[in-house]
């Protein structure tokens, strides 16, 4: 946090809101006035009530107000009390507040005779942070399950410490009139809470109760109302018990839920949702229930119980569990929830609706996104009825509008700390604060830094908006494979700048010419140039277009997140990315330079992918390409023993490789994982991206420390030759060695490759990024080996190493160049 003391002439540069309604009086000679603006995530967290109570305790007069820049405070009294007030603003803030900076100045007193909360004002640039949705707090939970409380079993209970924020806010500043709660008029009791400084609902914008707030309804798949209020929830619970699929309108969108113990129900959900084998997440009624099925660490428990309440990827229990000395009976979860997967994505109820439903059921449920595969989740009940009626048997809906969707976030613990895999509910749109990781010449404090819109990648898309030193990263959008997904992407690209009244100076996009996000970047710039409506043509400049290489964006994201300076060696391993030479990169070592540029200092030996992108779903194609690169025409002899393909398919792929037709070159480590999984018989065809690589990771035998051989070919850039590794691997296959041993030796070899290249380059800072580093063992092994060699190693925590982090990296890399 930064504290800036301004001068009386310009106290922090902020313009005051209009004067409060408090009367003025004669000013004691020893009184001074303290003027403050607090920036950060300080709206929607009870910050103004906190300031009010603190001022009352210290008997200070003045006012506090939300502005589009943050929280504005004027307070006056004795200097020693003002200094105490200033210290306690910094140290005693509400639990969910994030204070980024405080600007303050001492002025002559004006004569306020009371302290009040003023109406919010729109003034200056919009720099206040929008808070994510927050999981239900313990105080609200007590009320929800207290039969004597007026909010007993009320599924929309909230206070200043919890409830919806990002999913309901329409504009800044954060006030009820700027949220989707604006049409719900508070009853007398709620109004009294809202205006009581001693109540935790003091200025809680979504405040509501059964008398005046939103309500539930249950619908048939034909849209007929079945029941209302609490009866609607019981209808949904009974449907789940009966093995039916329920579409539930949650905090940031719809979820599809079924009994996680009912194999037939889970299979039916897969069939209707067109989701063959990709794992489902499971919501448990309690932490004790999760412990019955899973081995969870202390950190994983904290994540599950946190205000963010993400899905946490944990290991399934290997033996019978005991809790408090008593044997715990595990739930018999359906096999098809996560087939052939030793891990399970688990979460706890995070909204009042989930808490009441899970109390009613008291068993785990599958809770997956309310959409068809590759489409965005539904947010409107009428749209959901159209899109999900072929999946759901019953709909549990409500009348609180969802302004923007936010899917469940996903994290896992790697190297003793959390790693984001999907950043959405609970985290978005909080910004990532970035400094200057490269020694780019300063533009000077008086020159405004460019505002950058980064539009991300094609898969696992998110977008980012850079304003000064903050980068606001959107919620997870997903793969841009359907028109519905692309429409959601376009809405987010418009929504994020609109919230902050941002005029875009630079649009950053990927270099891949066929990505929809890249085309959007070009169209955005072209449209801005051709129609600068409403702009002063003498001042306005069209936005620049910055195309950022895919893997360089990965490196920039990880450097920015860890706030490290160049030079640094980026190890970027993933499935695919458009390279500077027009080939498919994915096994890269990029040296970040002090001038904001990079050099490709090493990469994996290339091989061809017959059929191009089809290899993502058919690992056997990667295997054939690998064998052909290594053995030429003799590859077909090896393929008879290792690759499961029909003779017709083999003949077709052979022609592609020999004639180099639709068989692009790649250096991808992701495709190398796929090839190895195919060669050892684990997976010939995949139903979702990364499936073969995941199964190769899961197959690893824990106690094996041996590694396959490899060769480093000197040159510029250096080339990592996997040929010796594949020859040894095929020999192991011929000896009927177990897949567990082969997988372990393969993983260990990859970690050694990183160490050898890093030592040859001679760079102390090593950055691990790209989707391959979602692999827990690979990351932990690489980190351990690099540390053994006294190298400093960095990896992701707040931002996903996969393509969900690309937008952040694009914004950072573009800022270094502009």
Q: Which residues does each PLM region occupy?
A:
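A contiguous, well-structured pocket-lining segment that forms one wall/lid of small-molecule binding clefts
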Residues: 213-215, 457-487, 491-495, 625-765, ...
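Active-site-adjacent structural elements in enzyme catalytic cores
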Residues: 121-438, 447-508, 512-524
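Intrinsically disordered, low-complexity, mixed-charge
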Residues: 2-10, 28-217
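Intrinsic disorder/low-complexity segments
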Residues: 1-31, 222, 227, 315-332, ...
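Conserved phosphate-binding/catalytic loops in two-lobed NTP-binding clefts
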Residues: 543-553, 765-766, 776, 782-806
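Short glycine-aspartate micro-motif
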Residues: 245, 452-454, 508, 568-572, ...
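Conserved phosphate/anionic-ligand binding catalytic regions in large, soluble enzymes, centered on
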Residues: 245-260, 352, 365-376, 512, ...
């Amino acid at each position: 946090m930064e504290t800036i003391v301004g001068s009386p002439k310009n106290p922090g540069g902020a313009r005051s809101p209009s004067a409060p309604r408090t009367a003025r009086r004669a000013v004691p000679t020893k009184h001074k006035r303290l003027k403050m603006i607090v920036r950060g995530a300080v709206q929607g967290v009870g910050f103004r009530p906190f300031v009010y109570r603190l001022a009352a305790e210290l008997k200070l007069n003045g006012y506090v107000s939300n502005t589009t820049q943050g929280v504005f405070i004027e307070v006056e009294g004795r200097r020693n009390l003002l200094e105490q007030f200033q210290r306690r603003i910094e140290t005693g803030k509400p639990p969910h507040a994030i204070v980024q900076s405080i600007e303050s100045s001492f002025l002559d007193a004006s004569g306020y005779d009371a302290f009040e909360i003023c109406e919010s004002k729109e003034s200056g640039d919009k720099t206040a942070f929008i808070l994510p949705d927050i999981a239900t707090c313990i105080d609200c939970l007590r009320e929800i399950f207290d039969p004597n409380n007026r909010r007993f079993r009320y599924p929309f209970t909230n206070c200043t410490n919890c409830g919806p924020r990002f999913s309901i806010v329409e504009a800044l500043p954060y006030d009820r009139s700027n949220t989707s709660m604006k049409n719900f008029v508070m009853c007398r009791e709620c109004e009294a809470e809202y205006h009581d400084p001693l109540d935790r609902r003091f200025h809680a914008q979504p405040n509501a109760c059964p008398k005046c707030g939103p309500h539930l309804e249950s619908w048939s798949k034909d849209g007929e109302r079945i029941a209302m209020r609490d009866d609607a929830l019981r209808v949904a619970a009974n449907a789940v018990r009966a093995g039916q699929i329920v579409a539930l309108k949650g905090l940031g969108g719809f979820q599809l839920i079924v009994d996680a113990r009912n194999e037939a129900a889970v299979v039916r959900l897969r069939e209707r949702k067109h989701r063959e084998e990709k794992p489902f997440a499971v919501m448990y009624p309690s932490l004790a229930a999760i412990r019955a099925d899973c081995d969870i660490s202390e950190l994983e428990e904290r994540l599950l119980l946190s205000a963010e309440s993400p899905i946490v990827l944990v290991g399934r229990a290997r033996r019978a569990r005991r809790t408090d000395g008593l044997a715990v009976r595990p739930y018999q979860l359906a096999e098809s929830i996560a087939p052939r997967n030793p891990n399970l994505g688990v979460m706890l109820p995070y909204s009042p609706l989930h808490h009441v439903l899970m109390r009613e059921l008291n068993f785990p449920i599958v809770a997956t996104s309310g959409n068809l595969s590759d489409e965005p989740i539904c947010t409107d009940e009428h749209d959901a009825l159209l899109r999900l009626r072929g999946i759901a048997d019953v709909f549990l809906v409500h009348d609180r509008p969802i302004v923007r969707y936010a899917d469940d976030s996903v994290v896992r613990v790697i190297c003793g700390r959390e790693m984001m895999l999907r950043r959405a509910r609970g985290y978005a749109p909080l910004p990532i604060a970035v400094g200057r990781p490269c020694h780019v010449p300063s533009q000077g404090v008086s020159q405004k830094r460019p505002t950058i819109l980064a539009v991300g990648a094609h898969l696992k898309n998110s977008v980012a908006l850079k304003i000064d030193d903050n980068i606001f990263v959107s919620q997870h959008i997903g793969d841009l494979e359907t028109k519905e997904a692309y429409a959601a992407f376009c809405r987010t690209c418009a929504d994020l700048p609109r919230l902050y009244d941002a005029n875009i100076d630079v649009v950053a996009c990927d270099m891949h010419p066929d990505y929809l996000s890249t085309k959007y970047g070009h169209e955005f710039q072209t449209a801005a140039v051709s129609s600068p409506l409403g702009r002063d043509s003498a001042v306005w400049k069209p936005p620049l277009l910055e195309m950022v290489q895919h893997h360089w964006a990965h490196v920039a994201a990880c450097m920015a997140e860890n706030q490290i300076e160049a030079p640094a060696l980026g190890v970027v391993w993933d499935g695919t990315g458009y390279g500077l030479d027009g080939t498919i990169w994915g096994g890269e070592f990029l040296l970040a330079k002090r001038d904001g540029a990079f050099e490709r200092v090493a990469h994996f030996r290339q091989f061809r992918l017959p059929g191009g992108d089809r290899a993502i779903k058919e690992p056997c194609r990667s295997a054939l390409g690998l064998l052909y690169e290594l053995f030429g025409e003799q590859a077909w002899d090896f393929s008879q023993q290792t690759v499961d393909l029909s003779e017709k398919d083999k003949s077709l792929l052979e022609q592609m490789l020999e004639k180099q037709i639709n068989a692009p070159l790649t250096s991808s480590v992701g495709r190398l994982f796929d090839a190895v999984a195919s060669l050892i018989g684990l997976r010939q065809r995949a139903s979702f991206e990364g499936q073969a690589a995941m199964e190769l990771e899961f197959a690893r035998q824990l106690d094996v420390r041996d590694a396959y051989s490899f060769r480093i070919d000197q040159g510029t850039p250096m080339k990592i030759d996997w040929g010796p590794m594949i020859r040894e691997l095929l020999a192991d296959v011929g000896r009927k060695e177990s897949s567990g041993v082969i997988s372990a030796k393969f993983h260990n070899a990859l970690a050694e490759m990183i160490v050898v290249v890093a030592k040859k380059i001679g760079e102390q800072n090593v950055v691990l990024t790209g989707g391959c580093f979602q692999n827990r063992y690979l990351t932990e092994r690489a980190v351990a080996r690099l540390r053994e060699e006294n190298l400093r190693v960095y990896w992701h925590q707040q931002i996903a190493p996969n393509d969900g982090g690309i937008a952040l990296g694009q914004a950072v890399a573009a800022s270094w160049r502009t």
